[in-house]
C-alpha cells in the first residue's frame, strides 16, 4: 500500500514520497524497510535516529531530527492503531455450524453466525447476527448473546447470562459461574448458598483470557457499556461497573462493590466488598481499597490513600533505617541525661 493511500484512509496529512510502498507495521526498534511505525512522544526521538522504518506516524508539530516519510496527527497512537487494521485482520471462522458442534434444537441463531468445532450450545440460547463462537466454547441454557460478538476458544458462558452487541470474550474466560457465597454454621462448617442471579455484559465490553465474572446470588452482576477487562481478573458476585471502565490484569473486586463511570483499576489492586467507587477514580497498581473512594480521586497504597500522600509516605519510608539509627542515638543520649540528673 502506498503512503498516499494510507494517509487517505487515515484522513491525515503526509510528508515524503507519495508512492512509497508500505507492507506492514512495527515498533521503532523492530521495524524493517517497508514498514510503518509511530512516535508517541518527543522523548523517543533517539529511537527515530536508529529505526529502519520507511515511514513513521508523529504528532502534528513534532520537529524530526532527520528526513523520513511521515504521517501527522493529533494522536499518533490512535492513528497507528487504525493503521494496524489496514495490514492485519484477525482470524474469522467461516459462517455456518461445524459438524462437530452440539446445538440444541431450540437455539435461535441470527444471520451470518459462525459456530466452530466442538462448541456446545444448550437450550433456549439466542445468538445475534454475525457473532462468532470459536472452538470448544460452552454456552449454558437461556443465554443471550448479541450481534457481532466474538467468543474465543474455551470460554464458558453460564446460564441466564446476557451479553450485549460487539463484545469480545477471550479464551478461557468464565462468565456467570456461581458467586462465592457460603454461610457459617454452628459446627464450624460452611453451607453453600445457591446463586440465583445472572451476569449482564452491556454493549462493547471486552473480557480478557482466564478472567472470571461471577453471577449474583440474586439480581445482577453488571459490567457497563464499553468497559475493558484484562486477563486474570476476578469480579465477585453482585459487582456493578459504570461505562468505559478499565480493569487491568490480576485485579480482584469483592462482591457487591460498585464502580462509577470511567474508573481505572491498575494491575493487582484489590477492592473490598460493598464499596462505592466514584466516577473517574484511578487506583494505582497493587493498591488495597478498603473503603469508599469519592469521584475523581487517584489513590495508592495499602490501605489506600490519596496518591500525593502515599508518595510522601514512600519518600519517608526509604529513609527509615537511617531514621531508626538517629532515634536510637537520641534515646541513648536521653537515657544518659536522665542517669546524670539532667546534666
Curated annotation (Swiss-Prot):
Name assigned to this protein: UDP-3-O-acylglucosamine N-acyltransferase
The reaction(s) this protein catalyses: a UDP-3-O-[(3R)-3-hydroxyacyl]-alpha-D-glucosamine + a (3R)-hydroxyacyl-[ACP] = a UDP-2-N,3-O-bis[(3R)-3-hydroxyacyl]-alpha-D-glucosamine + holo-[ACP] + H(+)
Assigned keywords, A-Z: Acyltransferase, Lipid A biosynthesis, Lipid biosynthesis, Lipid metabolism, Repeat, Transferase
EC number: 2.3.1.191
Pfam families noted in UniProt: Hexapep, LpxD
Domain of life assignment: Bacteria
Matching PANTHER family: UDP-3-O-ACYLGLUCOSAMINE N-ACYLTRANSFERASE, UDP-3-O-ACYLGLUCOSAMINE N-ACYLTRANSFERASE 1, MITOCHONDRIAL-RELATED
Any one GO biological process: lipid A biosynthetic process
Pathway: Bacterial outer membrane biogenesis; LPS lipid A biosynthesis
GO (cellular component) term, any one: carboxysome
Family: Belongs to the transferase hexapeptide repeat family. LpxD subfamily.
Amino acid at each position: 500500500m502506498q503512503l498516499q493511500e494510507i494517509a487517505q484512509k487515515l484522513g491525515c496529512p503526509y510528508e515524503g514520497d507519495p508512492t512509497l510502498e508500505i507492507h506492514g507495521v512495527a515498533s521503532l526498534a523492530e521495524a524493517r524497510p517497508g514498514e510503518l511505525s509511530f512516535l508517541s512522544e518527543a522523548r523517543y526521538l533517539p529511537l527515530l535516529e536508529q529505526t529502519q522504518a520507511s515511514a513513521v506516524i508523529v504528532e502534528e508539530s513534532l520537529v524530526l531530527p532527520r528526513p523520513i516519510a511521515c504521517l501527522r496527527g493529533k494522536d499518533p497512537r490512535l492513528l497507528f492503531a487504525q493503521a494496524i487494521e489496514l495490514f492485519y485482520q484477525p482470524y474469522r471462522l467461516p459462517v455456518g455450524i461445524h459438524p462437530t458442534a452440539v446445538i440444541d434444537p431450540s437455539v435461535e441463531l441470527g444471520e451470518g453466525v459462525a459456530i466452530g468445532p466442538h462448541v456446545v450450545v444448550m437450550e433456549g440460547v439466542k445468538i445475534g447476527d454475525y457473532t462468532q463462537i470459536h472452538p470448544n466454547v460452552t454456552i449454558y441454557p437461556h443465554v443471550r448473546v448479541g450481534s457481532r460478538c466474538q467468543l474465543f476458544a474455551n470460554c464458558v458462558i453460564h446460564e441466564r447470562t446476557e451479553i450485549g452487541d460487539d463484545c469480545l470474550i477471550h479464551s478461557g474466560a468464565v462468565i456467570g459461574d456461581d458467586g462465592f457465597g457460603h454461610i457459617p454454621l454452628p459446627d464450624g462448617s460452611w453451607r453453600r448458598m445457591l446463586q440465583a442471579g445472572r451476569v449482564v455484559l452491556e454493549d462493547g465490553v471486552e473480557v480478557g483470557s482466564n478472567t472470571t465474572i461471577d453471577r449474583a446470588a440474586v439480581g445482577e452482576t453488571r459490567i457497563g457499556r464499553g468497559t475493558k477487562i484484562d486477563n486474570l481478573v476476578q469480579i465477585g458476585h453482585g459487582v456493578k461497573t459504570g461505562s468505559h471502565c478499565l480493569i487491568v490484569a490480576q485485579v480482584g473486586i469483592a462482591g457487591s462493590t460498585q464502580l462509577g463511570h470511567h474508573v481505572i483499576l491498575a494491575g493487582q489492586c484489590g477492592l473490598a466488598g460493598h464499596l462505592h467507587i466514584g466516577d473517574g477514580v484511578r487506583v494505582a497498581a497493587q493498591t488495597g481499597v478498603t473503603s469508599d473512594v469519592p469521584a475523581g480521586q487517584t489513590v495508592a497504597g495499602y490501605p489506600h490513600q490519596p496518591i500525593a500522600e502515599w508518595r510522601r509516605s514512600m519518600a519517608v519510608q526509604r529513609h527509615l533505617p537511617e531514621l531508626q539509627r538517629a532515634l536510637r542515638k537520641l534515646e541513648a543520649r536521653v537515657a544518659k541525661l536522665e542517669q546524670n540528673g539532667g546534666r
